[in-house]
Amino acid sequence: CPTDVRMPKSYLHDEPGAMRAEQHGFDPFEQVASRVDAFEANGHTAEKIELLVLGGTWSSYPRDYQEHFLRRCFDAMNGRDAASIDRALAWNEQAARRNVGLVLETRPDHVDPDEIRWMRHLGCTKVQMGAQSLDDRVMRMNRRGHTVQQLRDAMIQLRAAGFKLVLHWMPNLHGATIESDREDFARLWSDPALRP
C-alpha cells in the first residue's frame, strides 16, 4: 500500500477525494459542505446524499472522534449544528439534504457484534471491506493481519445485520500468480459467505 504522510494509508494526495480533504484541512463539515455546493453549482440536486467515509479502517478510530466526524458531516447536510450524533441523525430525517446511505470502511478482524451495533448507532447502511485475497498464504505474505475465515465470518455477520456490502479484491498481489488469481476470483462467486 502506498504511504503518503499527508494521507491515510493507501490514499494518494492527488486523488480527487483526497485533494478535497486536504484542501479543507480534513474538516468533515467543510468537505461535505463544499461537495454539496459543487454538485448544486453544476445543476445537480443534493436532496438525497450517499456519504462515503474513506480513509482506512474506520473501526480503529476512537469512538468519540467517529461521533464528532459524522456529526459534523450531518451538520453540513442539515445546515445547522447539532449537540450530538443522535440529534444530527434525527434532524436529517426531515432535512432538505437527506442522507440516504452512510458507507464506512473496516477490516474483517474488526467486525464483531459490538462493532456492528456501533455502526448501526452511527447510521451506517453499507460497509466496505478490503479482503484483497481469498488465499491465506497470499494474505500472510502481504501482511494483511486477518484470515479468509475471519473475512467469511465478518461477511456473514454484516449480511445478517442487514448491511449492504462492498468487498475489495486485488489481483497480482505479492505471492499470487495468474492462475491463483483466477481461482481466487472464482471463489468470490462460489463461496456462499462471500458471493453477492
Give each language-model segment a name.
Residues C1-V5:
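Local cysteine-cluster metal-coordination motifs and their immediate loop/turn environment
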Residues D37:
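N-terminal phosphate-binding caps/lids of nucleotide- and nucleic-acid-binding domains
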